[in-house]
Amino acid sequence: YTLSLHDALPILVILERQLARVAEAGFTCYVHPEIEFYLVERDADGRIRPTDHAGYFDHVPGGTAHEFRRRAILMLEQMGISVEFSHHEGGPGQNEIDLRFADALSMADNIMTFRTVVEEVALQEGCSATFMPKPFVGRPGSGMHTHFSLFEGERNAFHDPAGQYQLSATGRAFIAGLLRHAREITAVTNQHVNSYKRLWGGDEAPSYICWGHNNRSALVRVPMHKPGKAQSSRVEYRGIDSSANPYLAVAVILAAGLKGIEEDYELPAETEDDVWLLSDVERGALGIGELPTSLKSAVVAMSGSDLVADTLGENAFEFFLRNKRREYRAYDAQVTDFELGQFFPRI
């Protein structure tokens, strides 16, 4: 997994270097991703369509999705990758498999292996798997909501029994770092032009920079605390999508959170409302900003980021920016079926 640029750091080493910084601060990081994807097939005309018409948590024994998940999980477990949960997601043909918490570097490796396993098992089932963030108009996008915990030795550094929502000052500062640097890191966590159709397509995808307690419209969610589960205290970053490079995405997320801890960022007030239902004026009054609306705007935000440049290293940083600029310029040059349908008949 190396960049094709002379002297660029291997992608894995970028994460290793960030984890060394986390360790220098006295922490160990554990990660738990919820990985969404679609199972698709081609119809008689060659058009891509979902393999089923099921919905959220549908369970049809003997169906393609059920058998697929059973076989995929069995293969993952045989390879030493532990699965926490699996279920059918909200879109037709959409599935989710959640991997059990592991240290950040092992989890990045596991995610890469996971994708290969899912694609292989899908082919064995006579279909294909796609981790494309938004493959269908009007259907939910595929995210990779990722939970983070920092430990100091055997103690969860995000837990404080006296804190609001059992969240420690360390956890609050970590969230504050994620929020302050969210725009800068979005090009890495959402690296394709298609990623922004998910972020701004509704269906519980986060578009606005805020946090909340069990608020699924927020960019950062603090899950409900369960009594007796102090070691499970965690922070969920909901922006990242299923196409992200896990080594780079985890590295920049940790860099943002660690910056918040080191500089003791103050956490803004939580958002209790569904952010999508608020007006622009209401969001403005609450100080809630927007994530980038396109890859181009995300690249502009990243290009001025000392934090991302320091995390990736100069060569990888510049390579990434050049690569993404080529991508959005190639995309912008396309004339789409939508444009032809809208304008060709009447202009």
Give the residues covered by each predicted segment.
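Glycine-rich, acidic/polar active-site loops that bind/position phosphate-bearing ligands
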Residues: L3-S4, A8-I347
